[in-house]
C-alpha cells in the first residue's frame, strides 16, 4: 500500500469525510460551523504541508479537528521516515 492510500485509510478510520483526486485529498468537515475546504498535497515536506493546512484553516474551526489533523500529519511524517 502506498503512502497516499495509507493516509486515506487513516482519514477513513477517524471518520473524517474526504474526497481524493489526482493525489490531492480534500477535506470538508461536517462538524465545522463554517465553510472550509482544504487540500492536502501528499508528498511535500512536513513543514510545507503544515503551512499549507494553516493557510487554509479559517478561524472558528473546531479545535479537536485541528488536533486531529496534526496527528494525521505526524503519522504521515513517521511513515515518510520509515519508507
Language model: regions and residue ranges:
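Metal-dependent nuclease catalytic core centered on acidic motifs
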Residues: 75-83
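A short, charged, amphipathic alpha-helix used as a generic interaction element across diverse proteins
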Residues: 64-76
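Short aromatic-glycine-(Arg/Gly/Cys) micro-motifs in beta-strand/loop hairpins
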Residues: 40-54
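Short, charged/polar, Gly/Pro-enriched secondary-structure boundary elements
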Residues: 32-37
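Negatively charged, low-complexity tracts enriched in Asp/Glu with abundant Ser/Thr
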Residues: 1-31, 50-66, 82-83
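Glycine-centered secondary-structure boundary/capping sites
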Residues: 13-15, 42-45, 74
Amino acid at each position: 500500500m502506498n503512502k497516499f492510500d495509507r493516509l486515506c485509510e487513516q482519514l477513513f478510520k477517524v471518520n473524517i469525510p474526504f474526497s481524493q483526486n489526482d493525489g490531492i485529498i480534500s477535506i470538508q468537515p461536517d462538524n465545522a460551523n463554517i465553510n472550509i475546504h482544504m487540500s492536502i498535497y501528499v508528498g511535500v515536506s512536513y513543514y510545507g504541508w503544515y503551512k499549507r493546512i494553516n493557510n487554509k484553516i479559517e478561524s472558528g474551526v473546531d479545535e479537536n479537528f485541528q488536533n486531529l489533523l496534526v496527528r494525521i500529519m505526524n503519522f504521515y511524517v513517521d511513515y515518510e521516515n520509515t519508507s
